[in-house]
């Protein structure tokens, strides 16, 4: 097509295509009622063939919970906050939490770690997910990338029904009230990807 057009015509075509491409702009507008999320990167996968419905029974699977302790966070009850928010978000989905995994249709567990204990390569290899948050500063010793992976299993088959991974910068000197709000936001964002049917 361009062989028969003179150089000025080619330039005009390229200019029109370029202007048309540049004029397509995406703008994000904050709604005053929208939930403000953390600066976490979140990714999730849910099996479309296994349906979780309201009223389904869930239980913790303690042997699949992996919380990597770090001395720099020893005064912050991060594990308790994560578990509280997982429970809160599950109940908001109108499922039923039971004490024993033997009496539940689904089991839930999680892994939480800083990058020094569990890096992106290990997360991808173990969980098949890679949120890939690269916005964490590398030159600040007060911040390290943290990862949280939540997984739901179907008890009878041991199939993974849903898994979600989030990554964000973890500031070691963050005040407790800010840390609590941040964990709440990250968990809310993760659970938005978990579909529960009527």
Predicted features, each with a name:
Residues 1-24:
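Sec-dependent bacterial lipoprotein signal peptides
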Residues 10, 75-80, 176, 180:
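Flexible, glycine- and charge-enriched loops at secondary-structure boundaries
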Residues 23-81:
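A structural "domain/chain start" motif
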Residues 25-49, 139-147, 156-198:
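C-terminal/domain-edge helix-coil "capping" segments
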Residues 57-115:
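N-terminal segment of the mature soluble domain
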Residues 69-70, 117-119, 172-174:
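Extracytoplasmic/secreted cell-surface and envelope-processing proteins
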Residues 102, 106-159, 167:
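Surface-exposed short loop/turn segments
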């Amino acid at each position: 097509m361009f062989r028969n057009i003179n150089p000025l015509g080619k330039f005009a075509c390229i200019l029109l295509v370029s202007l048309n491409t540049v004029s397509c702009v995406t703008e994000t507008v904050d709604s005053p009622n929208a939930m403000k999320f953390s600066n976490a990167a979140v990714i999730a996968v849910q099996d479309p063939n296994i349906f979780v419905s309201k009223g389904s029974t869930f239980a913790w699977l303690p042997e699949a919970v992996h919380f990597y302790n770090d001395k720099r966070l020893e005064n912050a009850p991060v594990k308790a906050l994560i578990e509280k928010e997982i429970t809160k978000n599950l109940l908001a989905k109108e499922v039923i939490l039971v004490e024993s995994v033997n009496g539940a249709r689904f089991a839930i567990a999680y892994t939480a770690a800083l990058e020094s204990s569990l890096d992106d390569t290990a997360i991808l290899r173990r969980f098949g997910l890679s949120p890939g948050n690269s916005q964490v500063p590398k030159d600040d010793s007060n911040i390290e990338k943290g990862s949280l992976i939540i997984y739901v299993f179907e008890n009878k088959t041991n199939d993974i029904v849903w898994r979600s991974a989030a990554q964000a910068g973890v500031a070691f000197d963050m005040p407790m009230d800010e840390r609590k709000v941040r964990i709440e936001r990250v968990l809310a964002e993760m659970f938005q990807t978990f579909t529960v049917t009527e």
